[in-house]
Curated annotation (Swiss-Prot):
Descriptive protein name: NADH dehydrogenase [ubiquinone] 1 alpha subcomplex subunit 6
Oligomer and partners: Complex I is composed of at least 49 different subunits.
InterPro entries associated with the record: Complex1_LYR_NDUFA6_LYRM6, NADH_Ub_cplx-1_asu_su-6
Domain of life assignment: Eukaryota
Gene Ontology CC terms: cytosol; mitochondrial inner membrane; mitochondrion; respiratory chain complex I
Record bears the keyword Kinase: no
Membrane topology: Peripheral membrane protein
Keyword entries, A-Z: Electron transport, Membrane, Mitochondrion, Mitochondrion inner membrane, Respiratory chain, Transport
């Protein structure tokens, strides 16, 4: 688990000089986030809920939501917030249901992992199919 130690050393970087440098930092952040996915999957025991590729998709979707921004200072601020969020997740500052609710259910990435207890009544069947734990 070398990823948590690498993320802790990140401080506030200087502002990007131009849009090209800010773009490079976005790609660096995306690589760091993708490299920490196996650690996150292990820490939060997410193997039964989501696949690593689906988490990569959720990260890229968050980045694409801000693709229209062209101000390097705003991009730097968003990267800083993203690194702070990633550090909190890797340092286990969030609980499993926070991760599932924000990045799995919020993105619609819940995968069906097979037959679970189906329940005896319609109410229980609906409850078990809607409950993502």
């Amino acid at each position: 688990m070398a990823a948590p130690f690498a993320l802790r050393k990140i401080g506030v970087p200087p502002n990007s000089a131009n849009l090209t440098e800010a773009r490079r930092r976005v790609f660096d952040f995306f690589r760091a986030a993708c490299r920490s996915i196996p650690t996150i999957m292990d820490i939060y025991n997410l193997q039964d809920v989501v696949a690593p590729s689906q988490l990569r998709y959720a990260i890229s979707a968050q980045i694409r939501n801000n693709a229209h921004i062209t101000d390097p200072k705003v991009i730097d601020l968003l990267i800083f917030k993203g690194m702070e969020e990633l550090t909190d997740i890797v340092d286990h500052a969030k609980q499993r249901h926070h991760i599932i609710g924000q990045y799995v259910v919020g993105e619609g990435l819940v995968q069906n992992t097979g037959n679970k207890d189906q329940g005896k009544t319609d109410f229980l069947k609906n409850f078990y199919t809607s409950n993502y734990f």
